[in-house]
Amino acid sequence: MVGGDFYDNPKPYEQELAEQRAKIIKEGTLPKEQYLINDTARKQIIPHMLETMKQQNITYSVIDGFHIPEQYVRIITLDFQPWEIILASDGYPYLCTTLQESEEKLTWQRENDPLNIGQFKATKAFAKGNNSFDDRAYIRFKV
């Protein structure tokens, strides 16, 4: 987020796989709560996910500790005024201008759609007993 404007860097396959997982769960015969214990829908998409992950930092960029080809780095030009910048991982389904708000939205998501198959779709759910469905990082600073 730069100056309140949201910039996303999604993995090219992730939304499609999240949609596929949501469809498997919605059309499945298992009780929905079962997927919080044993997410068999995720297990079905894992092979495709692993295959596409082989292209990380080859055909698209991710921050994973390895070299990122320059052509996949998004450059956001700023002028010489103060700018507030927020960098966050995809563990926040709804990025807000404060960490507290982002955490509140995460809590709302966990309480209202722990499978992540509604408005926000993900390739994994909030596993039973977990406060999150993914790792989280959030930093806000001004330049």
Regions found by a protein language model. Name each.
Residues N38-V143:
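C-terminal catalytic subdomain
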Residues M1-E51:
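Surface-exposed beta-loop interaction hotspot
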